[in-house]
Amino acid sequence: MLYNINDLKVGSDQDIILLIKCVEQGESQNGAYQRLMARDKQNHEIAIMNFTDISVKFKEPTVAKLRLSTQEYKGRISYQLINYVPVEGAVISDYLPKSKVNQADSWNYLVNTSKNLRPCLHKLVGMVLSANSTEFKVKALGPYKAFSRRNGILEATVKLTKLADFTSQILGLDRDLMLAGAMMYYVGYIDCMDDAFNITADDILIGAGTNTANRIKTQVQKILSGNDEQLKMSVDMTDVKLLCHMVMSRYKGIQPATAEAYALRYLDAMVTEVDSVETALSGYEPGSIITPLYGYGKLVKR
């Protein structure tokens, strides 16, 4: 039994246990087929073609024992499914990219930072993050490139918040608004990723910015419809509108209209682009010159 994709030998049929991240349906001149995206515990990923009469129907994502035919086709290795059996009791998270941060420390940093915000912003940040804390702490920011690993949303949020803190002081911006916006900037991504870190329809149809703004509005409505009159009076609708604008005025979003929104937009680009490059270079030796990768042109591993 194999567990590492790199151990598969060309020209033979072998058994291997992998995580099936997603199953795509397709149609060719020869009939219907399936394309399975699979990964092992060593962060290797492959596409497996299923041209058999056996339709892969299990609920994805799923860990399974796969019988594969491995052949060379047009200078590349081709993986074709022969059959499969789901593995009972397997832990999906064991197959996903590992975290680079301490989850508890990162979460505590956000909690402690939010305590110093003005009352309305403090309450909103606490309500939005607490309402989605489990997924917010665990999920990746995306399926590949920047922070495509466990705790990715949390890790990116902490880095963006720290940058927002220094930037607001250097540029004389509204520090509380900047910090609140930074702490909620990525929360909408929890709707854009599934448990195996695949993108969902929300990522394409709605987007993270709109998802985040909707979550802010939901918590505001809870406050306004509640019985705590003092809390209701603390709600500053101007701050709420500015927050919603900030989280939506990102790349792939609306045009920024405030200094704080512009600052967060470029800080977001800094945080995500730097991590994307670091991720792209992670598998290379120091001094390597890498041909155009991930749209960044040629890169050099320092």
Regions found by a protein language model. Name each.
Residues R149, F197-K217, P256, A261, ...:
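Divalent-cation-assisted or electrostatically stabilized phosphate/pyrophosphate-binding catalytic cores
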Residues S69-K100:
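OB-fold/S1-family single-stranded nucleic acid-binding modules
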Residues M1-Q14:
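OB-fold nucleic-acid-binding modules
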Residues Q14, F51-R67:
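Short nucleic-acid-contacting surface segments enriched for D/E, G, S/T with interspersed K/R
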Residues G11-E27:
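Structural detector for short beta-strands of small beta-barrel domains
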